[in-house]
Design a protein with these regions (language model features):
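Residues that define the transmembrane beta-barrel architecture of outer-membrane proteins
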Residues: 14-20, 40, 63-71, 85, ...
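Outer-membrane beta-barrel translocator domains and adjoining extracellular loop/strand segments
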Residues: 5-10, 56-62, 100-108, 149-156, ...
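Membrane-embedded beta-strand positions of outer-membrane beta-barrel proteins
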Residues: 44-46, 89-93, 123-125, 137-141, ...
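Surface-exposed strand-loop-strand hairpins of Gram-negative outer-membrane beta-barrel proteins
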Residues: 2-19, 57-65, 206-237
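Transmembrane beta-strands of outer-membrane beta-barrel pores
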Residues: 1-3, 26, 48-54, 93-101, ...
Length: 365
């Protein structure tokens, strides 16, 4: 159970947070070569957080938040552990719900998110006092983010930070060995070497330029997020990855993308910019291609997937939709019963701003 206080980055006014988690403490024998020992025996869990966001007052009268409920998964790992103290980091991912989202008439100042269901990510550090074999007291600091992930617009994103105190009761008195916090080991029964993967994906995108054009052309009393269309996106990729036999794999990728909104983007550019600027641009093509570096970090049959790429071909009007670089980050799952197939979900972004959520299905060759 955690009680915390946070501040959002826009109003700088505080609100409170209350969390409840159910955690699983991974274990194993010293030197067993398991995933748990390979990661220093992390704590995995699920939780619920209630944020009193309605306490935050906007500078504009036509703006407000509502209280938010978040369901998330979490991983917590100690980097340093003694008999009485532990110090480490926490990572949380999940979904949030809030009824106080953007509305052109009643909540126009809240341009941070435009849908009731939001993506959530958080990370931070903790200091733990081991009071007894079954009781821990913990102080921590977290940085958190919520956004509509381009499923709706406007989507400035809500960023907030703060700290809290928590108490953890353990149903078992057993604890991981202190000697293995830094001396993590390779995981047995995993083959080293190259693997090759092909995967295809798709998602839905809401265009920021289209929204700016609507704001400029539609009367305020008629402006609504329902006017903003959701555009299908698709991707096809090939990865060549080398796995070390333990937690990590590193490689290269070739990507192809299809955007369905190029005609609408050209319409928006002709409203936002001059005809001369539009005609001088590189044009508008639904197809783009790029290459990049990828890394996977494994835990059992799941992996955290991160990619940094550069476009070799992309014609998306005046602004080029954020430049030549792009990022993808998400989670992959390799179900043993469906081998060699895998599934994944990732966020595609430009300059670390979300473009769309990509759901993929792939095969390992």
């Amino acid at each position: 159970m955690t009680i915390g206080s946070f501040r959002d980055s826009y109003t700088s006014l505080g609100f409170n947070a209350f969390s409840l988690e159910l955690d699983f403490a991974t274990g194993g024998k010293t030197g067993d070569g398991s995933f748990a020992s390979g990661y220093g025996y992390p704590i995995l869990g699920v939780g619920l957080t209630y944020n009193t966001l309605s306490d935050v007052k906007f500078r504009s009268k036509n703006g407000h938040y509502s209280d938010m409920i978040t369901a998330y998964g979490t991983i917590s790992r100690d980097l340093l552990r003694t008999k009485r103290l532990g110090f480490g980091y926490n990572i949380q991912l999940g979904l949030s719900y809030s009824s106080g989202y953007y509305d052109a008439q009643t909540n126009s100042a809240n341009w941070f998110f435009s849908s009731p269901v939001l993506l959530y990510a958080g990370g931070g550090g903790h200091l733990t006092w081991i009071v007894s074999p079954r009781l821990d007291l913990e102080a921590g600091i977290m940085v958190k983010h919520n956004s509509s992930a381009r499923l709706a617009y406007p989507n400035g994103g809500l960023n907030y930070w703060g700290g809290g105190l928590s108490a953890r009761y353990r149903f078992s008195s057993s604890r991981p060995p202190r000697a293995n916090v830094f001396k993590t080991q390779a995981v047995r029964n995993l083959e080293k070497g190259w693997s090759y993967e092909i995967y295809a994906g798709g998602g839905v995108h809401a265009c920021a330029a289209e929204w700016r054009a609507l704001v400029k052309t539609v009367p305020r009393d008629e402006l609504s997020t329902s006017l903003l269309r959701k555009w299908p996106m698709a991707s096809l990729s090939f990865d060549a990855i080398y796995r070390t036999g333990g937690r990590f794999a590193l490689g290269a990728t070739v990507d192809g993308f299809w955007n369905s909104n190029t005609e609408r983007l050209e319409w928006a550019d002709r409203i936002l910019y001059s005809e001369e600027e539009v005609e001088a641009s590189k044009g508008y093509s639904p197809l783009s291609a790029g290459i990049g570096f990828v890394q996977e970090v494994f835990y059992r049959n799941a992996a955290l997937y991160v990619q940094e790429g550069i476009y070799l071909y992309r014609h998306m009007g005046i602004r080029g939709e954020h430049g030549p670089l792009y990022e993808r980050a998400g989670i992959r799952y390799y179900p043993p019963s469906l081998s060699p197939f895998f599934i994944s979900v990732c966020i595609k972004a430009h300059k670390f701003k979300a473009d769309y959520l990509d759901f993929t299905l792939g095969i390992r060759l």
